[in-house]
Amino acid sequence: MKVLHVLNSRIYSGAEKVVCQIIKSFRGEIEMVYCSPDSDIVRQMLAEQNVTYLPMKNMSVSELRRVIREQKPDLIHAHDMRAGFFSALCCGKIPLVSHIHNNAYDARGLSAKTVGYLLAGFQAKHILWVSQSSFDGYAFHKLFAKKSSVLYNIIDTQQIFDKKAQDSHTYDYDMIYVGRLTYQKDPQRLMRLCARLKQEKPDLNVAIVGTGELLEEAQTLCESLDIQENVHFLGFQSNPIKMVADSKAMILTSRWEGTPMCALEAMALGTPVVSTPSDGMKDLLEDGVSGYLTEDDEQMARDLLKIFADPEHRKYLADNAKRKFESINDADAYKQAIADCYN
């Protein structure tokens, strides 16, 4: 059996990690290949993991049909709505599995995106949703209830600790952010939060790992808030795991989320997570027990300052988060759910 994974992105972040994880978990059992618009970063990360990469000039019907003709897959696994739409246009009689990785705001009402995804929804033999909220949030979800299931993300724990061991550096960050700098992630809010924290902790040390269309805007705001000595924009990092492990806290200020891979990694590593109560995060964290969830910036600052100052409290949160992580991170069940969709 040959499976073609189709993505619309040129980045390497959460959904892209999920796809590589799926491909590696079926290695030796099912042939799988990764197809997306051409990207140097994706090419580099897939080469490191020995994952076959099929770059396209762009996401278009002609390019995707070319790949399908050349590869002759037995099944197409399309990730997120735009890739699902184009895959539905191109797949013909080839079975299609659609996989939605977040609960995007623009999927909640009547829009070109929600209407366009109807084609993929009707064409797909099965639809996987990263959280219950991502399913409930889609405007026309009731039409596809019988062919839908929720599949929360997991991570390869051994791989995480292997990556940690590969980095011999020691880091001294109070707080780390790992992810794209986009509207979804609200990096402007993150900058304002850092400025608030600096008022109480002048030596605040923050790492920002990632790139995105709002990078320059975030950097400009950082300078205008006079926190450029405290906030370090590190760009894309192929292995930020040791940075996460050494940080006192991980921060997420997202407007919406699925099940963030970075949060799962932090939980496994024992780094407390402080987040807005967005979608999948509410399934991962219990406020004040295994991390913090709040929509209020002042409360978020207080929670973070407590984590920075109190090692015992940090350990309490970390231990509870590790227990929660171990209870939900079932790699065998995840793999079986994927196999059931294919079969």
Predicted region positions:
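Acidic anion/phosphate-binding donor-loop and adjacent secondary structure
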Residues: 139, 150-172, 238, 242
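N-terminal strand-loop element at the rim of the active site
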Residues: 5-59
